[in-house]
Amino acid sequence: MTEFDLSTREGRWKHFGSVDPIEGTKPTTKNEMTDLQSTHKDFLFEIEEVGIKNLVYPVLVDQYQTAGTFSFSTSLTKDEKGINMSRIIESVEKHYDNGIELEFNTLYQVLCTLQTNMKQNAAGVDVSGKWFFDRYSPTTNIKAVGNADVTYGLAIDGDKVTRKELTIEATVTTLCPCSKEISEYSAHNQRGVVTVKTYINKDQDIVDDYKNKILDAMEANASSILYPILKRPDEKRVTERAYENPRFVEDLIRLIAADLVEFDWLEGFDIECRNEESIHQHDAFAKLKYRK
């Protein structure tokens, strides 16, 4: 058995099984290597979407930098074997500047670059990240940072936008109307997780504060908003407001829908509320879909 010098890194590597590289016969320069993806012949079917998922990149949501998780795709004609996936990252890098701004205009520019680099007609992106924003306590007006989850979806075909979506997930307080009605005092309440997926008009300019308008519809219709910081006067106000505004999951999604239906820049929406029930071992939920 060969003995290696364990005082060196190379010796330890070989001791654990590493071997020296062999003298190969295949090309080592890019121009000489076979490019299988670029093979052209009849591959039977065109592909609607092919690309990469779970690409994590820095993004900017308003004034805060956070991590975005991306899914990028392009179309592929039936006479092409595959796409060059490294060009997807190259397309992203062309628009990177201490983070990619999570706005539809920026994502549209990224997709246009992707179209050009991939030489395909269609391209799409979905990206999720944390949205951080200033939140003030209701009575003492102390500022802290709140958050919600956002997911942008955008797709283009040629110069036409074919899909434009925004999903927001936020947490609220819901107080049970039945518990309040039947009890001499108090009522059980819990944290509710509200998810709103909006389908945005592709041919109309969107309002500047669209995220805040959607979030307001989600939170204002709940029994209470959640706050990062609450002093005693704030906690009193939050508790009393929840008692004044009891909500079933059914109530909440209907009230949110009543606000969203008034936004002329929306073509439709899906709403789900899931209550993490404080007196049960199960959750309660309700879903609603609406198209104009």
From Swiss-Prot:
Alphabetically ordered keywords of this record: Hydrolase
Enzyme class per UniProt: hydrolase
EC nos: 3.5.4.16
GO biological-process terms attached to the record: tetrahydrofolate biosynthetic process
Pathway annotation from the record: Cofactor biosynthesis; 7,8-dihydroneopterin triphosphate biosynthesis; 7,8-dihydroneopterin triphosphate from GTP: step 1/1
Database matches in Pfam families: GCHY-1 (PF02649)
Top-level lineage group: Bacteria
InterPro entries associated with the record: GTP_cyclohydrolase_FolE2, GTP_cyclohydrolase_FolE2/MptA
Site annotation May be catalytically important: residues: 176
Entries under HAMAP family matching the protein: GTP_cyclohydrol_B (MF_01527_B)
Function: Converts GTP to 7,8-dihydroneopterin triphosphate.
Protein family according to the UniProt entry: Belongs to the GTP cyclohydrolase IV family.
Protein name: GTP cyclohydrolase FolE2
Lineage summary: Bacteria, Bacillati, Bacillota, Bacilli, Bacillales
Gene name tied to this protein: folE2
